[in-house]
UniProtKB/Swiss-Prot annotation:
Residues forming coiled coils: none
Taxonomic lineage from the root: Bacteria, Pseudomonadati, Aquificota, Aquificia, Aquificales
Function: Catalyzes the folate-dependent formation of 5-methyl-uridine at position 54 (M-5-U54) in all tRNAs.
GO cellular component assignments: cytosol
Native source organism of the sequence: Persephonella marina (strain DSM 14350 / EX-H1)
Residues engaged in binding FAD: 8-13
Keywords: Cytoplasm, FAD, Flavoprotein, Methyltransferase, NAD, NADP, Transferase, tRNA processing
Protein name: Methylenetetrahydrofolate--tRNA-(uracil-5-)-methyltransferase TrmFO
UniProt-listed Enzyme Commission number(s): 2.1.1.74
PROSITE patterns from the UniProt entry: GIDA_2
Catalytic activity: uridine(54) in tRNA + (6R)-5,10-methylene-5,6,7,8-tetrahydrofolate + NADH + H(+) = 5-methyluridine(54) in tRNA + (6S)-5,6,7,8-tetrahydrofolate + NAD(+); uridine(54) in tRNA + (6R)-5,10-methylene-5,6,7,8-tetrahydrofolate + NADPH + H(+) = 5-methyluridine(54) in tRNA + (6S)-5,6,7,8-tetrahydrofolate + NADP(+)
Length: 436
């Protein structure tokens, strides 16, 4: 019988430990609280929801809603307890966070196959066949050093500096052009063009936009990390024209001239269905981001699948160090799960914990690890964080991660519904087969 350690009893660690234990294997679950706590946690309970009490939308035509349905098919502990302690929240699955965490703690502490060890892990525990690292965005300083040694220090990030991402289908490509600076590269960037008057309007709204206040434990990040676009703009009206909005080296084929200002959109995935605003990390409030960035002519009707942010977040560059099975490339006995892998949101974190647990169970049985089909939201997410790219920025579940349907469907909601039905059908097959 193999020995397994799960480090961290957040959403991902709780799911991983539960999956392994309910599959008949022993697991040691390490949690440093209350011996050592974090600036964001308030209790010693497992799966404590430190920000919102909402696990996102329930509708399967939302990324989060579809992912939770897939998790249900995989026997999710988090989803079942969330439903047990749900509170009215319109179309979202919100919970009584105290009862939710307490119940998960009870289930895991009382499971005969789970041994809970309350201590800070400062080095990789020895004597285990498999180790799942699920230490979350507020990983302790001591264990961060362990992760740095495992992954290479340059592949561990201590903050998110996230720029908004738009659905490529909603960009007006007539308001700009594809091309790289000085004609180098393969034309992977779409350049949204602004004239002087449009820039003036955009600039004034940007510097006056309402910002999200920084939490105490995030203060250092602001200075160490990338400067928010609005802070850069406040240094002077010309600053952006020599920074993220510089037009140098770009010629608009329509005019044969260099534009006054550009905002570059870069492909976020191979299919080019997701485009991110290059250098536009921001602390603007979400409604302000939509309002202000839609002043860019090409983005007038854009759908934002992810909005920008800058906050404290320990995460690895999974695309360089992990396989899609969530195993460490250089040591496949070690798996990562949760927000530390570069997924974003409660549901996505928990879902990767389920997958890590599934793969440990398979390997304990002498089988090869597995990945859900790319047509599923979980399959799309793990492929996104592990497929080759320049740099990984955390991603939430959204429909742009899923491959196109065989037939073109014009109606957006219908298209999402058909993708969701396909995903659930494929996940049902995966759920019935992963144990075999």
């Amino acid at each position: 019988m193999g020995k397994v350690a799960v480090i961290g009893a957040g959403l991902a660690g709780s799911e991983a430990a539960f999956k392994i234990a309910t599959s008949g294997f022993k697991v040691d679950l390490y949690e440093m609280r209350p011996v050592k706590t974090t600036p964001a946690h308030r209790t010693e309970g497992f799966a404590e929801l430190v920000c919102s009490n909402s696990l996102g939308g329930k509708d399967i035509t939302t990324g989060s809603g579809l992912l939770k349905e897939e998790m249900r098919l995989l026997g999710s502990l988090i989803v079942s307890v969330a439903e047990e302690f749900s509170v009215p929240a319109g179309g979202a699955l919100a919970v009584d966070r105290v009862k939710f965490s307490r119940r998960i703690t009870e289930i895991l502490e009382n499971h005969p196959n789970i041994k809970v060890i309350r201590k800070e892990v400062t080095q990789l525990p020895e004597g285990y066949n498999f180790i799942i690292i699920a230490t979350g965005p507020l990983t302790s300083e001591a264990f961060s050093k362990v992760i740095q040694r495992l992954t290479g220090s340059e592949y561990l990030y201590f903050y998110d500096a996230i720029a908004p991402t738009v659905d490529a289908d909603t960009v007006d490509f007539s308001k700009g052009f594809w091309g790289d600076r000085y004609g180098k590269g393969k034309g992977d960037y779409f350049n949204c063009v602004l004239n002087e008057e449009e820039y003036e309007i955009f600039y004034n709204e940007l510097i006056n936009g309402k910002q999200v206040p920084l939490k105490d434990f995030e203060k250092a990040v602001f200075f160490e990390g990338c400067l928010p676009i609005e802070e850069m703009a406040r240094r002077g009206k010309q600053t952006l024209l020599f920074g993220p909005m510089k037009p140098v080296g770009l010629i608009d084929p329509k005019t044969g001239k260099q534009p006054f200002a550009v905002i570059q959109l870069r492909k976020e995935n191979r299919e080019g269905t997701l485009l991110s605003l290059v250098g536009f990390q921001t602390k603007l409030k979400y409604p302000e981001q939509k309002r202000i960035f839609r002043l860019i002519p090409a983005l007038k009707d854009a759908t934002f699948v992810r909005l920008g942010s800058i906050h404290r977040n320990t995460f690895i560059q999974s695309h360089r160090v992990l396989k899609p099975t969530l195993q460490l490339k250089k040591d496949p006995r070690i798996l990562f799960a949760g927000q530390i892998t570069g997924v974003e949101g409660y549901a996505a974190s928990a879902a990767t914990g389920i997958l890590a647990g599934i793969n440990v169970v398979r390997m304990l049985k002498g089988k090869e690890p597995t990945v859900p089909p790319e047509t599923t939201m979980l399959g799309g997410l793990v492929r996104y964080i592990t497929e080759p790219k320049e740099e990984l920025q955390p991603m939430n579940p959204n429909f742009s991660l899923l491959p196109d349907l065989d037939k073109k469907v014009r109606d957006k909601r219908r298209r999402k519904l058909l993708k969701a039905e396909r995903a659930l059908k494929d996940m049902e097959i995966f759920a019935s087969q992963w144990k075999n």
